Amino acid sequence: MKSLLFVVFIFLTTTYAAKVSFKVIAPDAKNRVHVNINGVLVELKASDPDVPYYTGFAELKHGQSYNYVVDGNAEPFKRLLNGSSTKNEFFNRPVTYATNIPELPSILTEGSWTRGDTSNPIWDSNYVPSIFVTGNPREMNELIENVKKNTYKTKITFIGPETINTFEGCTLGLHKPGRKHNDAKQSWIWALPEGQFMANRNWFKIRHMEEDPTQLREKLYADILRKMGTYANEANMVRFFINKEGMGIFNMLDDVIMYSYINAMFYHGDTPEQLGGLYDGASGASFNFPGDFDSFIPNVESPLDQDAIEPFSKAFTSIDFLEDEQVKTIGKYFDYDQFLRFMVMEFLTGDWDGYWQEQTNDGAYIDINDHNKIYYLGQDFDATFGVNLEQKREFVNVSYTEYPKLFPGGVLINRLLQNPGVKKTFENYLKITVQEIFNNATLGPYVTARHEFLAPDLQWDRSIKQRSPGNIFGWTFEQTYENLFEGVTAPGKNSGGADWGLLEWVAAKEKAVKSYLSSSEAADAATVTQVPEAPGTDGTPSESTAWPHANTRFRQAEASNTHKIGTSSPSNFIVKIKQGTVSSSSSIKRTPCILPLVILASTLFASFF
């Protein structure tokens, strides 16, 4: 009897057709969109004519496959679904939600940042969101073709893995348009209407990543920093459309010099009565005293001007860094534990356009709700992993101990490293980061899996002819893969600066750091003597082994999924999930600045130093 019941149960589950909700994004659709189930076409409809997002219901048996048909053209692959609703799928993309990308380990957990909002699905890197801007056609063409500094009112629709959000009355513009050496593929910014937020943010920026053939470096940098327990910007890859015209794939990220980022990452969206001073660090923003504090450009809503940086810089200059008690004191007014983590990453990636080497692309936030504590802000992580690096290739082997002599302008990190305890902490962070994340055993599978997932969108991106004026490198789709392992030369008028492969750099830096640490006193780095206010981590991670394919192309036979390189259309991609199926699955409160705030900051610092 039990056997009979089991057979009946199996029969029912394999023959019963359930009503399923289908959702697909089809930007190129001109007429009709259908879901095809065993030759039966069911039409899907778009509720908003501005957004090519088609939905509908159809009967689907358990284990039955389906695909989408747009204007008579069917996807050349089948999809499988477990559940009563698809995720927000994209036409001709075989993998909607990645399940085979390894998770990077979280390290340096003691003292890691916990104040920020990072859990929203818009930052889920296993999905590629789609963003649709709807604006006046004449204004949008003017913006694209003439790269105006004007901003325009638009409607912006954000489609995530499960949800769709539309905001009317957004302000859209280009990020720093019209500069002499801008790339034709522009970067964009927009603000949500006053009082409206998404993921506790009301300001978004997307960067083009044209300097990097792989388009992976900048997001990878931020991903690693957050795994190191920092408050680094969130980032995710997105598809971007203006009036249904595809502009390409971009890196959407927090703009750290905007209060949107501060509100989300420092206060979980619970905005305090008074926000602190916020600054964009331009060239020369070194924190040195005496120095040019005009390099710190206050946010237009900042209640403090650039002179509020001076008391900290002056006090920092007076510190005797051989005295632990003085270092402990300054830790109350400068989160240098977080700063050390940022500097470890700058060193490992050879970030030549950041704080340590050039004193630029940084920033600062003064939290007036926490004793005017200063937080270092890092931004724009594109000049990393060997991209556009003018140093000789031997530079990858240079020890961090040589940096103070090579780059004397980085006074914050150079002086902190004069303290033996801080130096030990820095070396411990460096060692753990290389052992646990910054090595080819970890990053090799992670980076190649991310490339596999993004490959159809990278090929689409490389096929777009940009209508804006500017530099065109002409990186090919094949080079998005090749530059993971070796240098490549752009076929355009400018040959580009991709002389290093991304993983080639990682392998070389991993080898150099391990060699340095093994020949120094870092043999006992796990028993570091900590300086108060700069905690390290407990335990000694196991030593990683070199990823065997660090300097060669990833062997398709050894990968957990495969794809054909150099095919003519995204539909030719073969993506095999481990399970064997294709899964589808600006308004911030502020009050006017008052002079006593600056005086108070000066008094507080003077009383401690």
Curated annotation (Swiss-Prot):
In its keyword annotation, does this UniProt entry include Signal? yes
Give the UniProt entry's GO cellular component terms: plasma membrane; side of membrane
Q: Which InterPro entries match?
A: Ig-like_fold (IPR013783), Spore_coat_CotH_CotH2/3/7 (IPR014867)
Residues with an annotated glycan are N82, N397, N440
**Keyword annotations of the record:** Cell membrane, Glycoprotein, GPI-anchor, Lipoprotein, Membrane, Signal
The record describes the protein's role as:
May play a role in cell adhesion.
| Annotated propeptide span(s) | 585-609
User: Can you locate the GPI-anchor amidated serine lipid attachment residues?
Assistant: S584
The record's listing under Pfam families reads:
CotH
- Signal peptide start-end: 1-17
Q: Where in the cell is it found?
A: Cell membrane
What's the protein name? Answer: Spore coat protein homolog 1
Instruction: Kindly give the membrane topology term recorded for this protein.
Output: Lipid-anchor; GPI-anchor
Gene giving rise to this polypeptide? CotH1
- For this UniProt entry, what is the primary localization, expressed as one broad class? membrane
Q: Where is this region: Disordered?
A: 527-547
Answer yes or no on keyword Lipoprotein: yes
